[in-house]
Amino acid sequence: MSFPYSLKPFNTFGVEQSCLSMIEVHSKAELQSTCLSLYQSKRPMLVLGGGSNIVFTDDFNGTVVRVLTKGISCSEDGTHFYLAVEAGENWHELVQFSLNQNMPGLENLALIPGTVGAAPIQNIGAYGVELCDICDWVEYLDLESGNLLRLTTDECEFAYRESIFKGSLRDKAVITAVGLRLPKAWHPKLAYGPLQSFNAETVTSREIFDRVCEVRSEKLPNPEELGNAGSFFKNPIVSAATYMQLAAHFPSIVGYAQPNGEVKLAAGWLIEHAGLKGFALGNAGVHAKQALVLVNLGHATGQDICRLALHVIARVNEVFGVKLEAEPRIMGLTGETSLDV
């Protein structure tokens, strides 16, 4: 089966699949009317931002709605800057905008691919900062009522790579805008890896931004050169007891203590030390510089990528007894599906 609209330019893995129809929306009103019409018609619909967190395993027998809405408005009070951002804005460009406006707080999240509207769905995060730390509200279209509604940060039920939009509002909501709240009393977040060498008293937000961009550019391949979706696996969270057992057998294991006493393990370390860094299965491979990233080595299909992911999960579980979970959405013929394609 082949549909008329190619999806290859609209997914960063560069997988060659197609869809039945495609609509580009440039305004919030257009986004509302388009999505409501499709939802009420009960036809398969996929709302797509940057396509940086998705694996197409088949042609999509429905309509892809590309969100291209733009707009950033800023306000402030005595303690905070506030940004209201339309869903179609590019996330990294928003980070640059905020720094250029002397509104620090987003620098740790530099170079994360995708759009602002996609950011709350999986509560994007990097280098010790998550969206939930700076999110004020999320506005969404309720597909059942047709109303625009707004959730506070608490109501979004954010967790590690999780939110209400992956839970009870999955397939029922389309994010239209996101509100951010940045403290004027800025404090650098330097707990992770390459940022630990900075002096908290003297470092600037621009220096953190530059370092994050430098490190991400070194480790993460440019999707235009080597198709990928960034980090493919979530960093698994284990109990303190499990971590101690693992550390006894693998003294160099990388883990980060969590506020609740659990430990977040570095999935990239687990994959590398399971002997899979640079491993390839057909046209899909584990990136040679960053084992957390799966790449399209040429003409990989979505099935190739999923098969490789399942192999990585099985091998890491075999070596460490830890089960990895995939981050990207796996999209089949009529909607979201599982890795086991």
UniProtKB/Swiss-Prot annotation:
Transmembrane segments: none annotated. It catalyses: UDP-N-acetyl-alpha-D-muramate + NADP(+) = UDP-N-acetyl-3-O-(1-carboxyvinyl)-alpha-D-glucosamine + NADPH + H(+). One of its GO terms (biological process) is regulation of cell shape. Gene3D superfamilies: 3.30.465.10, UDP-N-acetylenolpyruvoylglucosamine reductase, C-terminal domain, Uridine Diphospho-n-acetylenolpyruvylglucosamine Reductase, domain 2. Pathway: Cell wall biogenesis; peptidoglycan biosynthesis. It is found in: Cytoplasm. Keywords: Cell cycle, Cell division, Cell shape, Cell wall biogenesis/degradation, Cytoplasm, FAD, Flavoprotein, NADP, Oxidoreductase, Peptidoglycan synthesis. InterPro entries: FAD-bd_PCMH, FAD-bd_PCMH-like_sf, FAD-bd_PCMH_sub1, FAD-bd_PCMH_sub2, MurB, MurB_C, MurB_C_sf, Oxid_FAD_bind_N. GO terms for molecular function: FAD binding; UDP-N-acetylmuramate dehydrogenase activity. The active site is at R161, S231 (proton donor), E327. It is an enzyme of class 1 (oxidoreductase). The keyword Cell wall biogenesis/degradation applies. Its EC number is 1.3.1.98. SUPFAM superfamilies: FAD-binding/transporter-associated domain-like, Uridine diphospho-N-Acetylenolpyruvylglucosamine reductase, MurB, C-terminal domain. Residues 13-185 form the FAD-binding PCMH-type domain. One of its GO terms (cellular component) is cytosol. It comes from the Bacteria. Its cofactor is FAD. Belongs to the MurB family. Cell wall formation. This is UDP-N-acetylenolpyruvoylglucosamine reductase. It comes from Shewanella sp. (strain MR-7).
